[in-house]
């Protein structure tokens, strides 16, 4: 630990005595954001800082260096996968399954866009998959078992100057989201 490092409770992990990151990572490829990327968390004027937290930028939204690196890396990786990112209105929507199997994203993408990759899955197979999932039963997509209980996440981001706003964040079982 360096002299200027601040220790605190991380808002992401809930862990105490963590080194609080001073700056948050740049998030890239949010549609409509600055070409060099934008920040999810930032305070660029002293008037935006909380009273008593003016010793370091990171103290206004205390996130550990580890958690900031982790969320920045994961979010940039998800946004880099154009196949599973959609724009609705002014909101960039990114979605993923907890076990990181893209088959869940592929099925959800059909619901969002109404388009499916030609030849990948027939209409009949898709109907069977969706019927099983809606009944709470596992389904199979190209030898990947689709579990309706799999945790699934949907994040909506909107650009605002050099910052990003979280429009919504949903977490539920895949079957319930469908």
Model-flagged regions — what are they?
Residues 13:
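Short Cys/His-rich metal-coordination motifs, predominantly Zn2+-binding knuckles/fingers
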Residues 1, 17-178:
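Extended alpha-helical scaffolding segments
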């Amino acid at each position: 630990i360096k002299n200027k490092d601040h220790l605190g409770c991380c808002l992401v992990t809930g862990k105490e005595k963590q080194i609080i990151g001073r700056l948050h990572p740049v998030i890239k490829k949010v549609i409509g954001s600055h070409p060099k990327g934008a920040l999810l968390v930032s305070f660029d004027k002293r008037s935006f800082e909380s009273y008593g937290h003016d010793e370091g930028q990171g103290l206004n939204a205390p996130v550990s260096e580890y958690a900031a690196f982790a969320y920045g890396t994961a979010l940039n990786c998800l946004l880099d996968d154009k196949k599973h990112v959609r724009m609705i209105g002014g909101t960039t929507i990114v979605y993923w399954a907890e076990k990181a199997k893209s088959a869940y994203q592929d099925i959800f993408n059909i619901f969002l866009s109404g388009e499916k990759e030609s030849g990948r899955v027939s209409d009949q197979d898709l109907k069977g998959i969706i019927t099983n999932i809606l009944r709470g039963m596992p389904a199979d997509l190209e030898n990947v078992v689709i579990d309706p209980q799999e945790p699934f996440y949907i994040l909506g981001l909107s650009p605002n100057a050099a910052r990003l706003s979280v429009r919504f964040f949903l977490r539920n079982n895949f079957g319930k989201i469908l």
